[in-house]
Design a protein with these regions (language model features):
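An acidic intrinsically disordered interaction segment
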Residues: 1-9, 93-95, 99-106, 127-135
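Hydrophobic helix-and-loop "lid/oligomerization" segment in the mid-to-C-terminal part
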Residues: 3-27, 31, 35-65, 74-81, ...
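Short, motif-level signal for alpha-helix interfacial/capping segments enriched in acidic residues
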Residues: 3-10, 88, 140-143
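Short beta-strand segments
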Residues: 24, 85-88, 110, 159, ...
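Glycine-rich, phosphate-binding/catalytic loops in enzymes
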Residues: 39-41, 101-104, 124-125, 178
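A broad structural signal for alpha-helix termini and local helix breaks/kinks
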Residues: 48, 68, 142-143
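Active-site cofactor/cluster-binding pocket
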Residues: 62-121
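Short alpha-helices
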Residues: 112-179
Length: 249
């Protein structure tokens, strides 16, 4: 496994060239999408206080609201001389902020299969358990230049936790745990993080039980279930809660 130092250095150099940086991610965000964008933004704001750094998207997450809200929209003309960084998004059709193309240059940072490459610079590592792990790696690689605080570290750790199945998935390795440990050393409150991640209302618990009872297993061992509008209405689910069904399977 390579450490991707060359592309990471190119990304840092590109960040240094711009006074305005806009960070976005995929729509219907999960913990990794929210954590990576907010965590990266936090690092850049601390490291380069003279720069304008925005996290701009067209949707939000109630489940992950404890990590903070979205930034207010900015005027379209401010994109023209901005660097846009897209996190955790394999293809451009899934980018939440549709104004991303107005930026002067585009960087893609992702850990999904690179089926449709895009961006002036692209750092894709399919072996990583989460995009947040890659952001932690980016910070640690340039630790002498990049600063972090407990707020940014909390966002990044949350994304690592949620995308790795609480560090249970096979994509987790020693590097994953070492990066998580570095975030812990910043001084984050893991008890607070896990308590917020476990705050589901009773309707969600009933839906989860229903999914486990009704899901099907294909001949190839793939678990699946259909979630339609009627089911969503029955359990009083938001679109975000309904789409989270994949995490139960």
């Amino acid at each position: 496994m390579t450490d991707n130092f060359e592309i990471k250095k190119k990304i840092l150099d590109k960040i240094k060239q711009y006074d305005r940086i806009i960070i976005t991610r995929h729509f219907r965000p999960d913990g990794d999408a929210i954590g990576s964008t907010k965590g990266l933004a936090g690092i850049l704001k601390l490291s380069f206080p003279q720069k304008e750094v925005y996290v701009l998207n067209e949707d939000s997450s109630q489940y992950l609201a404890f990590l903070g809200g979205e930034d207010a929209p900015i005027d379209d003309e401010k994109y023209a001389d901005a660097l846009v960084i897209v996190c955790d998004t394999a293809t451009t059709d899934r980018i939440s902020n549709k104004k991303y193309a107005l930026g002067k240059e585009l960087i893609k940072i992702d850990h999904h299969i690179d089926v449709k490459p895009y961006g002036d610079l692209s750092w894709v590592d399919e072996e990583r358990s989460s995009l947040c792990e890659m952001i932690a790696d980016f910070w640690l690689t340039f630790k002498d230049e990049l600063k972090i605080d407990d707020e940014a570290a909390t966002c990044i750790f949350t994304g690592m936790v949620t995308d790795s199945g609480r560090f249970k998935f096979s994509s987790v390795d020693g590097d994953t745990m070492r990066r998580a440990a570095a975030l812990l050393d910043v001084g984050i409150n893991t008890e607070w993080i896990y308590s917020n991640l476990n705050l589901d209302d009773f309707d969600v618990f009933k839906f989860e039980a229903y999914v486990y009872k009704k899901m099907k297993i294909s001949k190839n061992g793939v678990a699946y279930i259909y979630v339609d509008k009627a089911m969503q209405k029955k359990f009083k689910l938001t679109n975000e809660q309904a789409s989270n069904v994949v995490s139960y399977l």
